[in-house]
Amino acid sequence: MALTLTDVKRIAHLARLEMADADAEHMLGQLNEFFGLVEQMQAVDTAGIAPLAHPIEQIQEVAQRLRDDAVTEVVDRDDNQRPAPAVQDGLYLVPKVIE
């Protein structure tokens, strides 16, 4: 898929972008290079190849590097609501802003 300069200008117009002719020509080159790369990737036969969730999972075992969840502090709702101007049944009361 190759774009033309008219296509780039139309897309810029639809996106409400002001684009000088030199910038549009530069963008045209970049977009056509990108679409060329996409066409090359689509031409590769990937039948029978399982998708990868992580790019290096074929090389080594991949484990998430996250710590285990652990309680670090106890949240006391009453203490947190004490400075609030108005609270009822554990809920913060705020002024009505929409009629």
Curated annotation (Swiss-Prot):
GO terms for biological process: glutaminyl-tRNAGln biosynthesis via transamidation; regulation of translational fidelity; translation. InterPro entries: Asp/Glu-ADT_sf_sub_c, GatC. Disulfide bonds: none annotated. It catalyses: L-glutamyl-tRNA(Gln) + L-glutamine + ATP + H2O = L-glutaminyl-tRNA(Gln) + L-glutamate + ADP + phosphate + H(+); L-aspartyl-tRNA(Asn) + L-glutamine + ATP + H2O = L-asparaginyl-tRNA(Asn) + L-glutamate + ADP + phosphate + 2 H(+). GO terms for molecular function: asparaginyl-tRNA synthase (glutamine-hydrolyzing) activity; ATP binding; glutaminyl-tRNA synthase (glutamine-hydrolyzing) activity. Its EC number is 6.3.5.-. Gene3D superfamilies: Glu-tRNAGln amidotransferase C subunit, N-terminal domain (1.10.20.60). NCBIfam families: gatC. Allows the formation of correctly charged Asn-tRNA(Asn) or Gln-tRNA(Gln) through the transamidation of misacylated Asp-tRNA(Asn) or Glu-tRNA(Gln) in organisms which lack either or both of asparaginyl-tRNA or glutaminyl-tRNA synthetases. The reaction takes place in the presence of glutamine and ATP through an activated phospho-Asp-tRNA(Asn) or phospho-Glu-tRNA(Gln). Belongs to the GatC family. HAMAP family: GatC. Heterotrimer of A, B and C subunits. This is Aspartyl/glutamyl-tRNA(Asn/Gln) amidotransferase subunit C. It comes from Burkholderia cenocepacia (strain ATCC BAA-245 / DSM 16553 / LMG 16656 / NCTC 13227 / J2315 / CF5610). The gene is gatC.
